Amino acid sequence: MISISPSGVSAMQSGRFDDLQHRIDGWLCAELPSWLKRTVGQRKDDLHAVIADGREAGMRVETDFALYALLMFLPGGNWRDIRDERHVAEAMMLPDVTAPNKLMWLEGWLAERGHQIAGV
């Protein structure tokens, strides 16, 4: 399971990518009820694509991947369309913004669209 906290922010070692998809899936199951409406196969395929997209863009921090996945899989949108919104992509890729700051930015972005991250 993924826990978003200031102490959890660090660049991942290459071995950590091996189970990243499983950890993010567990976190999304807890944070996003609509995520459970997808089949296990759909979730696996979609997460694989989003993680590959994040890696290609240079993401290296677990919480960045988790927040990026949450943003991409909100109900009512195609994740590729959301990803292509320039300000979303730029904000999530900033290397000098810590996860709590990204979480605050994302929380505001979600609130504008009527969503809220549980426990934040």
Go through the PLM ranges and name each one.
Residues 1-120:
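A contiguous, surface-oriented mixed alpha/beta subdomain in the mid-to-C-terminal portion of proteins
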